[in-house]
Each structure stands twice: as structure tokens, then as C-alpha cells.
Amino acid sequence: MQLHKPVLLKDVIENLEINPEGIYVDLTLGYAGHSSEILKKLSSKGKLIGFDQDSFAIEKSRQRLSQISDNFVLINDNFVNFKVYLDKMNISFVDGFLLDLGVSSVQLDFAHRGFSYSKLGPLDMRMNLDQPLKADDIVNGYDQESLCKIFIENADVKLAKQVAKGIVNNRPIKDTLELVEVIRSSLPAALVRKKNPAKAVFQAIRIAVNDELIVLKKFLAQSLDFLKKDSKMLIITFHSIEDRIVKDFFKRQVKNKHDRRLPIMEQKDYQVKTIKPTEEEIAQNRRAKSSKLRIIKKL
């Protein structure tokens, strides 16, 4: 199995400013691309905690990380539940959080997971294979209005109403490639030639299946309480919807606490910055093209 190539790896490691004795939480472990480099920098007193819903990813990461060190804990659950596990471990503060919100290339490569719009597979798209809701339930079960809402809110799908109507009129849709064909045939030829419209539709359905935006918002609301002074949270985003959520959340944290009209020195509790991939990284890793690394530091 070819390992998932982590995006913005150098920037992540540099900006985490890893304390060898610190506690670092990778909330989207994947195949430990980022985590393996974090673990290499930790001493025996440090700890890495990794979350992933995908049990296959957890097992592969365990094998990979075990070759580096044993001071890690892997948790097969959605990162939205991170607080429950940190409380169980009596951890009140961490030295860094990392989220990589992209779908791993391994998940895309496995046609049977149904994430890829270029491979024949079932309409699945579940990151947690134990959950009941699948892409098939949405594609073949939701009404036109609900589909349209998902397409607009999760991916800004162009001509979402036409795509939703096309799906409803062509049911039952059996697999990923049939869905791609239905999407393409629902839209004007000029739009289809310009850009593969299936990409945004698949993104919207995947987000709905896994409740990704709600999970992200719930996590952000609890996250900063766990950061130590001078520690950071790093979030890699890949599309405008999730990026806007992170950007707006960070923006609210750095807002001046005092009325600007008052003669009081500006007080800020957080510092933020954004990093984009270099042309060199994009050339080496196509996935990096749409990525952004957003960083918030507790002061």
C-alpha cells in the first residue's frame, strides 16, 4: 500500500515548535504522515495522541508509529469526542492540536470506499464503517430540495437544483460512476467541459454522510480551552466552506476585547497566521494545491 503523502509537512512541524516533553494531539491521524514526524521529536516524557474513525487507518498507523517509539495512544473515534478521552487520561492541557481536514489519498485509492469519482465503487463514503448512513441513502433516498440544500451548503455546487433534479429522475443510481454520469448529463455541456462537476457533488455528499462541518464547529467550540499558553492549533483546510468556518472562528478569537474608543491598550489572547503551499510542494504533491494551513497561538 502506497502511503498517503502528508500536505504541508515541513510547515506543520516547524510551526508546532515541538516541545520534546509535550502532549500533541493529531485529531485526523490518517496514516500517520504528520504524526510520525511529531513522534520522532518527542522524548520518552512526551506523548502523541491520535484520533481516526477509520479502523484500518488506526491499525496501519499503529504499525508505522511502533517502529519509532511507544509513547503514543491511538483512539478509533471521531475527533469531536476528544474531550471525553482527554478527561479520561486526566489531560487538562495540550501543547498542540493538528487537524488535516482532507480525505486521504489511500481512501480515494480504495474504490470500495466510494470516495472517488474516477473509480467504480459503491455509494458509501463513510469514514466510520460502523455508522449506518451511507452515500446511497442520500443519493437514492433524499428528496430534491434536501439534495439541493446539501449541494449548496457543503460545496457551492453550480446549478445545484438541476443536479438534484437529475439524480431524483434517474433513480435508482447503483454506483459511483453511474452517479458521475447522471451529474454530467444534468448540466450544460460547456460547464462539464470546463471542470468535472462531479468533484463538488461528491464533496457535498461526503460531508453530509460524515457530518463534517457540524463536527468541525463542535470541535472548535471546545478546542482552545485545552491549549496551554504559547501553544498552537494547526488546521489544514482544502475547500472554501470548511476554510471559511476556521477563518471566521480564528477571527473571532483575535478581536480586540476593548472598545476602540477607550484609551486602553489593545489586548489580544490569540495570534493567527495562514500558510499556503509553495509551487515546489504543489509540483511534488498535487493534493497540496487547494490546501491552506491556518494557525492559532494562545498568548
From Swiss-Prot:
| Keywords attached to this entry | Cytoplasm, Methyltransferase, rRNA processing, S-adenosyl-L-methionine, Transferase
A single GO molecular-function term is: rRNA (cytosine-N4-)-methyltransferase activity
What catalytic activity does the UniProt entry give for this protein? cytidine(1402) in 16S rRNA + S-adenosyl-L-methionine = N(4)-methylcytidine(1402) in 16S rRNA + S-adenosyl-L-homocysteine + H(+)
Biological process terms from the Gene Ontology for this record are:
rRNA base methylation
Origin: domain of life: Bacteria
Q: Name one Pfam family in it.
A: Methyltransf_5
User: Which compartments does it reside in?
Assistant: Cytoplasm
Function recorded in the entry:
Specifically methylates the N4 position of cytidine in position 1402 (C1402) of 16S rRNA.
Task: Identify this protein by name.
Answer: Ribosomal RNA small subunit methyltransferase H
Identify the coding gene.
rsmH
